[in-house]
């Protein structure tokens, strides 16, 4: 049960991380750094892309 909870929370955080990164990149283009490897890279200013 504990493992299931951890997995669910991890998926939610991962989804929120990706969604936030997409919003930040496409709406502002500012640098954005994330704790998870899926979002550990940054958005180049004004390029509106995550690398």
Curated annotation (Swiss-Prot):
GO CC annotation terms, alphabetical: extracellular region
Top-level taxonomic group: Eukaryota
Predominant localisation class: secreted
Alphabetical keyword list: Disulfide bond, Knottin, Neurotoxin, Secreted, Signal, Toxin
Record-annotated disulphide pairs: 25-39, 32-43, 38-50
Tissue expression summary: Expressed by the venom duct.
Cleavable signal peptide: 1-22
Keyword Glycoprotein: no
MF terms in GO: toxin activity
UniProt subcellular location: Secreted
Function: Probable neurotoxin.
Domain observations: The cysteine framework is VI/VII (C-C-CC-C-C). The presence of a 'disulfide through disulfide knot' structurally defines this protein as a knottin.
UniProt record similarity statement: Belongs to the conotoxin O1 superfamily.
Protein name per its UniProtKB record: Conotoxin Cal6.32
Native species: Californiconus californicus (California cone)
């Amino acid at each position: 049960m504990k493992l299931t909870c951890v997995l669910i929370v991890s998926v939610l955080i991962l989804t929120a991380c990706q969604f936030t990164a997409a919003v930040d990149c496409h709406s502002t283009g500012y640098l954005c750094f994330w704790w998870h490897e899926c979002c550990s890279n940054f958005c180049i200013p004004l390029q509106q892309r995550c690398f």
